[in-house]
Design a protein with these regions (language model features):
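Gram-negative outer-membrane beta-barrel transporters
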Residues: 532-534, 554-649
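A beta-strand signature from Gram-negative outer-membrane beta-barrel systems
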Residues: 15-54
Length: 725
């Protein structure tokens, strides 16, 4: 699957429904015949292949989310068969999901006064309502020409629509004495988009391949075309403000700072407010991928094998945003009409704490119905600074590899190889001139580099049940497109600015892994491993507050940087087994668990003002992660309880440790159950519940108690029936 998220090189896994996936390949260690852009290993999503015999399956289900309080719809269908004496295989699938959801969110940023006292300088209450609709269609064909030659084709189309409304109350520029400007904002869209912000993401992938055998010599080839797009038509924001308000801010519990208006002040929309801004934007982002690869295998005596091949990947990505601000010609009449079309979003079930109440906002229907392009009602002006995030990027990665698999003895196998990747980049961004209020294209920038990536893997079969593996590999992590482009991305609604960095280098990783696996005679295994990674030039966002650019002061400034080098040490443990070793009657009960410990330290830290600071951990690297699953399987009944844990880790780095942002620890628990019966027609009833612990997305600033964001999504349940004919 080649579809990619706009602005990055991350595959869009949530765009593809789970029922369209046949298998998930996880590779902890990257071999020379795999793409090297995988410091932590690789994950490949394999869509459904054509079957060995006729297959007909249908799924129908529903679900419920406690925030949206609306039902979910899940539908799926699969048909597969073989034709012409089993020479031709066909599999077609379709999936549809409609999932209303939402979230309750509080966000804060913290500042330190000259007296050393800490206070909140930005305070937000947000409420989201989202409806996500997914449609997915896939087809797979294979043609067995003869015993030595086979052709395959796969195609998939995914369409994901997200309709989102957001209501936000913001105490902006909140000072230590409690003075602030109150901002009340509604995010909406036009009536043809349900009066909501529509984010339409479409991905398609078509792949043709062949497998051929010429005597002992084997080869395979693959050619693919992929296209991804993201459109946001008519995204609207209406924002009201009231200056010089006074608040009492209770910081006795820094996890939940709470502001209450002083006498004569308010944070509720009323006729004292004025229009801050009314905007509409169009966003269109497109990416195309062309790939071709060929692999050749030549066996030797004694089980040795030589494999070599080449691959070319050509990517193009364009981002285009158009942004307009509208001013009512009669602002008094506009404000009067706006205050007649409000909604109260206060909710006693607000999950961060019901003491936070979102309040009153302009209604989404009212915001969507505004005739903004009527010159007798509104003055229209294109906002040049918002166009500075547009870019065009081109990337070509040409690679070749050689891999030799050798049997040293009957029990020892060695794999050695070298991969060479040549990366060529060309990109054009935008610059914004505040004095002239114009945006212009930058000159096209070019960059190219070659990476030589050796690898060595060893496997020792101590006996049939005990295996020892060791490896050295070299991998890399390329910067995101949007990080490289010399552009300026300004979010006026949040007063934030992000600047690209064309000088970014790819992060390089030298990986050492050693593991031992013991397989039980009954189904199960226990394994232990250690690993070490030396990462050079890792990339992280540097954050600055109250940053001045082109004469404007922005609340938050972000720029990606090569921040230095890092060393990571870790251990991995896993255990999987049913309980039949205790008593045969317990064979139906089993346990699966994994645990990883990672110790990381940064060297040569080069952020301005923090050069060579010691004791810092690698961003994005939790010290502890664990997964556990307890299951029961018997007579068609399957029950599973799963738990996932990850400890906190640093996510973004600021001007000092006080401004560092951390992703807090998470505890997730899910449960699912199913019952299958029937022989010729198998019927399965299923039910599942996700996020049983109502785990929020939580960030904190500097110390654990200082909440930056706490966003709750609630528990989700699904149930339905699957029929296989």
């Amino acid at each position: 699957i080649a579809q990619c998220l706009v602005g990055s090189e991350m595959c869009i896994r949530d765009r593809i429904p789970a029922d369209m996936i046949q298998t998930i390949e996880v590779n902890k260690v990257v071999t020379p015949d795999m793409d090297a852009d995988a410091i932590g290993g690789s994950i490949n999503l394999i869509t459904k292949n054509s079957p060995y015999k006729r297959t007909i399956a249908a799924t129908a289900g529903t679900g419920y989310n406690w925030i949206s309080e609306k039902a979910q719809l899940n539908l799926g269908f699969t048909y597969g068969d073989r034709f012409f004496n089993d020479k031709l295989g066909l599999m077609i699938s379709a999936s549809y999901q409609n999932s209303p959801s939402g979230s309750y969110d509080t966000e804060f940023t913290w500042e330190q006064g000259e007296d050393g006292k800490t206070y909140v300088n930005d305070y937000q209450i947000r409420q989201y309502y989202v409806t996500r609709e997914r449609q997915s269609y896939s087809a797979a064909l294979d043609w067995d020409i003869n015993a030595n030659h086979k052709l395959t084709f796969k195609g998939i189309f995914n369409n994901r629509n997200d309709w989102e409304n957001r209501y936000r109350t913001n105490l902006k520029d909140l000072e230590a004495d409690g003075s602030a400007t109150v901002r009340i904002q509604t995010k909406a869209g036009t009536p043809d988009n349900r009066n909501a912000r529509l984010e339409r993401q479409r991905t398609m992938d078509f792949a043709l391949g062949g497998e051929h055998l010429f005597g002992p010599f084997a080869m395979d080839w693959h050619a693919s075309y992929a296209k991804a797009s993201e459109e946001r038509p008519n995204e609207r924001y209406i924002d009201f403000q009231l200056k010089k308000q006074k608040f009492n801010v209770d910081l006795s519990n820094e996890r939940q700072p709470f502001a209450t208006p002083k006498d004569g002040s308010t944070m509720t929309l009323n006729d004292k407010f004025s229009l801050k801004e009314l905007t509409e934007q169009q966003e269109d982002i497109k990416e195309q991928d062309l790939k071709f690869s060929a692999n050749f295998k030549l066996p030797f005596k004694n089980g040795n094998k030589l494999k070599f091949g080449a691959k070319v990947v050509r990517k193009t990505k364009d981002k285009e945003v158009d942004f307009y601000e509208y001013s009512p010609l009669n602002e008094d009449a506009f404000m009067e009409n706006s205050l007649k079309n409000t909604v109260d979003q206060s909710n006693k079930h607000f999950m961060p704490n019901n003491k936070y109440q979102a309040g009153i906002y302009a209604g989404k229907e009212y915001t969507g119905s505004l005739d903004l392009n009527n010159a007798s009602l509104f003055e229209k002006e294109q906002v040049q600074e918002e166009l500075a995030g547009n870019f065009e990027a081109r990337e070509t990665v040409s690679s070749g590899y050689v891999r030799f698999d050798q049997k040293i003895t009957d029990r020892v196998e060695l794999m050695s190889g070298l991969r060479i990747e040549n990366t060529n980049l060309a990109y054009t961004g935008r610059t914004y001139d505040a004095d002239e209020d114009i945006t212009s294209k930058t000159e096209r920038r070019h960059n190219s580099y070659i990476n030589f990536l050796p690898s060595l893997l060893m496997k020792w079969n101590v006996n049939e049940d005990f295996k020892v593996r060791g490896s050295f590999t070299q991998t890399l992590s390329r910067p995101k497109y949007s990080a490289l482009v010399p552009s300026v991305n300004i979010k006026r609604s949040d007063n934030e600015i992000t600047i690209g960095n064309p000088e970014l280098k790819p992060a390089m990783s030298y990986n050492f892994d050693l593991s031992a696996d013991y397989y039980f005679r009954s189904i199960g295994l226990v394994s232990a491993g250690v690993f070490y990674k030396k990462i050079d030039d890792f990339i992280v966002n540097q954050i600055s507050n109250n940053y001045e650019y082109q004469g404007n002061v922005y609340t938050r400034f972000t720029q990606p940087k090569n921040a230095g080098n890092a060393n990571l040490f870790g251990i991995e443990l896993s255990y999987q087994r049913d309980f039949s070793f205790i008593a045969p009657a317990l064979k139906c009960i089993g346990f699966y668990g994994t645990y990883t410990y990672t110790h990381s330290r940064i060297e040569d830290f080069n952020f301005e003002g923090r050069e060579n600071e010691e004791g810092l951990s690698m961003p994005g690297s939790p010290a502890h992660t664990a997964n556990a699953s307890l299951y029961f399987e018997k007579a068609g009944l399957n029950i599973r309880l799963s738990y996932n844990f990850a400890s906190e880790f640093i996510d973004e780095m600021g001007e000092s440790a006080f401004y560092d942002r951390y992703y807090d620890k998470v505890n997730y628990m899910d449960a699912n159950a199913s019952y299958t019966f029937g022989k010729k027609i198998k019927t399965t009833f299923y039910a599942e519940a996700n996020n049983l612990l109502n785990q929020p997305l939580r960030y904190y600033q500097g110390t654990k108690d200082r909440t930056m964001q706490a966003e709750y999504y609630g528990v989700k349940v699904n149930a339905g029936v699957k029929i296989n004919f």
